[in-house]
């Protein structure tokens, strides 16, 4: 049986020399018939994704990492737990299309971060966190994304199209995140299909997966970024993990399923639909 490493899609660098690392989990790949090729996403236009957030995460004095996130309220950013776990501070970029050219920028400390109490870094379960920021003024380039209604909690979304966005690597050969915001339209697959690749111990009801036909996929540096329904713009997931064999190899990409955490989000932010 072939083994593959599943990784959280976070890109980290040190100031001395850029280095890519990920938090690894070795799992059996049950379906090894997939193939893929590198196909970049599309470049976003200014204001196309006004809820997109960029996060520069200070890990230590000499190292930092990049993740994505989404603005869900005028004081709240939603992202992945594996992005914020152990960070010293976070610089939040709002309203940007070019990665660090933002309409508004805030730096907050670790005390402004709420990580899910049951986050498990060894299995990537409950990979979700919140960042509280100073109140932001909405504009054409800064808007909150809509979250799923509680009534839709049991929807699988299988077969629907969704849009993922972020500044992550645009190819497996890239060594750093991209400057310009990228996006891709992806097809949601059932968890049963996704589990054929990663196994049922990894893919659970709190995940949502997409196919990466043609090698179009999320990649390192996209972690925590939004997955929204193409039909409505409602955010249903946040980028969590993929396969270490490569972003463009055709293996499914996995997200944290937001309908599993609507109560948690409401408890901590007061936001609900």
Q: Where are the model-predicted features located?
A:
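C-terminal subregion of chymotrypsin/trypsin-like serine protease catalytic domains
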Residues: 2-19, 53, 66-84, 91, ...
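Extracellular/luminal ectodomains of metazoan preproproteins built from arrays
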Residues: 14-47, 139, 146, 153-160, ...
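Chymotrypsin/trypsin-fold serine protease catalytic domain
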Residues: 22-27, 89, 106, 128-135, ...
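Conserved H-D interstitial segment of serine endopeptidase catalytic domains
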Residues: 31-32, 55-58, 77-80, 84-121, ...
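Extracellular/periplasmic catalytic domains that process cell-envelope and extracellular macromolecules
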Residues: 43-48, 71, 84-86, 102, ...
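A conserved glycine-rich beta-strand in the N-terminal activation segment of trypsin-fold
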Residues: 48-52, 56-74, 123-124
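Acidic glycine-/aspartate-rich tracts in secreted/extracellular proteins
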Residues: 58-60, 82-86, 95-100, 133-140, ...
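Active-site loop architecture of trypsin-fold serine endopeptidases
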Residues: 61-62, 120-122, 154, 167-184, ...
């Amino acid at each position: 049986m072939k083994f593959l490493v599943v990784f959280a899609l976070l890109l980290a660098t040190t100031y001395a020399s850029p280095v890519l690392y990920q938090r690894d989990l070795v799992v059996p790949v049950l379906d090894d018939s997939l193939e893929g090729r590198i196909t970049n996403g599309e470049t976003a236009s200014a204001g196309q994704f006004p809820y997109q957030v960029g996060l520069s995460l200070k890990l230590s004095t000499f190292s930092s990492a990049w993740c994505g996130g989404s603005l869900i309220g005028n004081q709240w950013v939603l992202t992945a737990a594996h992005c914020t776990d152990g960070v010293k501070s976070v610089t939040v970029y709002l309203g940007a299309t070019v990665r660090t050219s933002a309409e508004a920028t805030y730096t907050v400390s670790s005390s402004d971060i709420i990580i899910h109490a049951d986050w498990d870094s060894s299995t990537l379960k409950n990979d979700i966190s919140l960042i509280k920021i100073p109140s932001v003024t909405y504009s054409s380039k800064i808007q909150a994304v809509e979250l799923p209604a509680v009534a839709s909690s049991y929807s699988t979304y299988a077969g629907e199209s969704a849009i993922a966005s972020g500044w992550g690597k645009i190819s497996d050969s890239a060594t750093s995140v991209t400057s310009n915001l990228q996006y891709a339209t992806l097809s949601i697959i059932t968890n049963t299909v996704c589990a054929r690749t990663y196994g049922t111990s990894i893919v659970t009801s709190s995940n949502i997966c997409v196919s990466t036909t043609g090698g179009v996929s999320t990649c390192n540096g996209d972690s925590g970024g939004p997955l929204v329904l193409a039909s409505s713009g409602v955010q249903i997931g946040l980028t969590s993990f993929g396969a270490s064999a490569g972003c463009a190899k055709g293996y499914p990409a996995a997200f944290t399923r937001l309908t599993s955490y609507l109560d948690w989000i409401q408890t901590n932010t007061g936001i609900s639909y």
